[in-house]
A protein has these predicted regions:
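ABC ATPase NBD coupling module
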Residues: 40-54, 62, 84-91, 95
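ABC ATPase C-loop
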Residues: 133-134
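Helix N-cap at the start of a conserved alpha-helix in ABC-type nucleotide-binding domains
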Residues: 152-154
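Q-loop/switch helix immediately C-terminal to the Walker
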Residues: 67-83
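Conserved ABC transporter NBD signature motif
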Residues: 32-39
């Protein structure tokens, strides 16, 4: 149901990440059908599914491009599910939107749009990844143990941020 938070529980190697990868389209299924909001997406690629699926990975270094700036990463996320050309996305209107969104993190990143993503700590990158996942509406947000690589204090911050973003956007989350 829309807005529900579903938790998948299992031991290491049980297939939790594989399950999320099949939903995202990065792994093809051998049989069965995957439907998102009543639409059969089984044969659609990960890029085609990106219109409906947002994702935050376990590894804070995944899901962002360390060689690109914060604003370039956010511009790519803003174009999720579309052809991704940075040039048209890096304009004053979008920069203001990115600053506004980043300000909710209270990490002063709204003043560092031109810094390379690789300069951020793991916790900062994970917070930005979560924010990037919510820039465009999606039908489902996949969180693959997105706090596992973080220290306890940062993990608590990212979980609080997750709750806020999921609630504000009424996201269905796994």
């Amino acid at each position: 149901e829309e807005g529900e938070f579903v938790t998948v529980i299992g031991t290491n190697g049980a297939g939790k990440s594989t399950f999320l990868n099949t939903i995202a389209g990065t792994i093809r299924v051998d049989s069965g059908k995957i439907s998102l909001n009543g639409i059969d997406v089984t044969k659609k690629t990960a890029h085609q599914r990106a219109h409906w699926v947002a994702r935050v990975f376990q590894d804070p270094m995944a899901g962002t491009c360390e060689g690109l700036t914060i604003e370039e990463n956010m511009a790519l996320a803003y174009k999720r599910g579309e052809s991704r050309f940075l040039k048209g996305s890096l304009n004053a209107k979008n920069r203001e939107l990115f600053r506004e969104k980043l300000s909710i993190l209270k990490l002063n990143l709204e003043n560092r749009l031109t810094d390379r993503m690789g300069l951020l700590s793991g916790g900062q990158r994970q917070a930005v990844s979560l924010l990037m996942a919510s820039l465009q509406p999606s039908k489902i947000l996949l969180l693959d143990e997105h706090t596992a690589a973080l220290d306890p204090k940062t993990a608590a911050f990212v979980l609080e941020l997750t709750d806020r973003i999921v609630s504000e956007n009424n996201l269905t989350t796994m």
